[in-house]
Amino acid sequence: MVRKIFQTNAELKDWLSGQNSAIIFIPTMGGLHPGHQYLIQKAKEKKTNTNQIILVSIFVNPLQFSKGEDFKKYPRNIKRDAELAFSAGADAIWAPEYDEVFPGGADSHFKIEVPKTLHNQLCGAERKGHFDGVATVIIRLIKIIKPKKLILGEKDWQQLIIIRKLFQELSIPVKIESYSTQRDQSGFAYSSRNSYLSDSERVNAQSLPNAIKEAKTEFDKGKVINLTKIASIFKENNLKIEYLKIVDPFSLKETENINRLCLLAIAVKCGSTRLIDHTFLMHRKPIIAIDGPAGAGKSTVTKAFAKKLGFIYLDTGAMYRAVTWLIISNSIDPNDQAEIKNILKDSKLEFKNSSFVEQKIFINNIDVTEKIRSPQVTSMVSEIAKQQFVREVLTRKQQVIGNNGGLVAEGRDIGTAVFPDADLKIFLTASPTERAKRRALDLHKRGYEFSSIEDLEKEIKERDKKDSERKIAPLKKAQDAIELVTDGMNIEDVLKELIDIFRSKIPEEVWPTPNS
């Protein structure tokens, strides 16, 4: 493909009309640096076919600069920017003039007003109207380009949160992908404004990335971050603090709840140059809870999700099925709680060969991976799972496994009972009819006979009723869970949706996507 630089809408549209390609869009204001190149490289890596174009825009948006800010001196070097963009993998560059984006001027077009609850935090508290300008221009660019995917950096975290919220509320059908902040060898977050710093200012400004790194290290050791100490260091280095806060990463409001994902956010001025930086704070690796009724496809997609993102996979349903199999194989009455307690006390339950495809479950050194999927186990597992002692024993085992995080677990009560502090909770469900069809396919695949899909649907409804009405840890959607109805979706569709939801809650900086 011949690399192109366009300056007018007509040139861009004429070229795009002949491409028949989906556009991956990376908006910039120019002044490109290795952080921008990283976004372009990630976009290139994620291309799924040749019918995708990586388009980089270069447009210094006047609407996001207040009076007295650096609009006039913002770095502008289209030749250099084009070289950097193309060398990183861009297919085309769109560098429009103001009238191409706002024909007749900005006053001739609708303007977006960002909710004050988001705008007036952090950067927006000082830069009045800044994010209104960002939101307005991104809508204009999206309208002109019509991309399938938008690539953004996590360095401008507040901007990312606002654009995600904007697209969600306006139902804009563009997927947003974000990637972690990139830093130079000294720890500086790449920024177009770094070029403003004199040599002496650069020495003073080094205290910003140093403070970020030290605070993260101290937090990971279980120590309290001393904001007063950080402020003192900045003062010694002639940095004027605009904000220095620990905030909730989504509401952007100050928080003292450091047991959940937090954001240490900092903005300072070094001379006339404004610098921002942040780091995420998390006491453990993320825990993802996926709940839902029988037959919703939890096990299949959770395994795939764990493999894709590098999580430990915990199939809690298999644990209850293994205990049920043990009770059946020992001819124990499912209502004989004393005998069940007795056999469980000396039982050893473990997962082995934990590759994501071949994970097997053993009880008392017996591989029961296939045995626990029998209709006999399926019909009895609800009766066993509702017993308090059984749930207490298995819940403790599950919590021990998830003590350090880095885990995705699926079951009926993961988000409500096992990991109520999970960082993301999904309630995966489907209609009884859909689940009966899936169950029939699974039974046929495993070589089990069944009477009819109608009977399977009836059994599923009965199972749902039992699971929902049991007194101990009933099946229910956690208050803060996101519901995903999977009727008509294949495994790949569900997996993509889950990953999109995950990425809207867990930044790349916190849990990077493993290289395939």
Swiss-Prot record:
Location within or outside the cell: Cytoplasm
Binding, (R)-pantoate: Q64, Q159
InterPro entries: Cytidylate_kin (IPR003136), Cytidylate_kinase_dom (IPR011994), P-loop_NTPase (IPR027417), Pantoate_ligase (IPR003721), Pantoate_ligase/cytidylate_kin (IPR024894), Pantoate_ligase_C (IPR042176), Rossmann-like_a/b/a_fold (IPR014729)
Major subcellular site: cytoplasm
EC assignment: 6.3.2.1, 2.7.4.25
GO biological process: nucleobase-containing small molecule interconversion; pantothenate biosynthetic process; pyrimidine nucleotide metabolic process
Region described as Cytidylate kinase: spans on this chain: 280-516
Keyword set includes Nucleotide-binding: yes
Keyword flag Kinase: yes
GO cellular component, one term: cytosol
Family, similarity comment: In the N-terminal section; belongs to the pantothenate synthetase family.
Purpose: Catalyzes the condensation of pantoate with beta-alanine in an ATP-dependent reaction via a pantoyl-adenylate intermediate. Catalyzes the transfer of a phosphate group from ATP to either CMP or dCMP to form CDP or dCDP and ADP, respectively.
Name under which the protein is recorded: Bifunctional pantoate ligase/cytidylate kinase
Organism: Prochlorococcus marinus (strain NATL2A)
